[in-house]
Amino acid sequence: MAVQQNKKSRSARDMRRSHDALSENALSVEKTTGEVHLRHHVSPEGVYRGRKVVDKGADE
């Protein structure tokens, strides 16, 4: 089992943990359809930034 050489201070521990926080997903509302989707992703209807970029039946 690993044993530490020197005790880490509370400050060092907290500075290490400062990057561990989770953030919520950034969601956007499509202007034309009103659908909610992830930022910089195509909506389920195939619309991105107000333009139809993917035909719904194309992937089938």
Swiss-Prot record:
GO molecular function: structural constituent of ribosome
Keyword Ribonucleoprotein found: yes
Key words of the record: Ribonucleoprotein, Ribosomal protein
Superkingdom, natural source: Bacteria
GO biological process: translation
InterPro entries the UniProt entry points to: Ribosomal_bL32 (IPR002677), Ribosomal_bL32_bact (IPR044957), Ribosomal_zn-bd (IPR011332)
Basic and acidic residues bias: start-end ranges: 11-22
Keyword Ribonucleoprotein: yes
Cellular component aspect of the GO annotation: large ribosomal subunit
Region of interest: Disordered: 1-60
Family: Belongs to the bacterial ribosomal protein bL32 family.
HAMAP family: Ribosomal_bL32
PANTHER family attached to this UniProt entry: 50S RIBOSOMAL PROTEIN L32, LARGE RIBOSOMAL SUBUNIT PROTEIN BL32
Protein known as: Large ribosomal subunit protein bL32
Species this chain originates from: Pseudomonas putida (strain ATCC 47054 / DSM 6125 / CFBP 8728 / NCIMB 11950 / KT2440)
Gene encoding the protein: rpmF
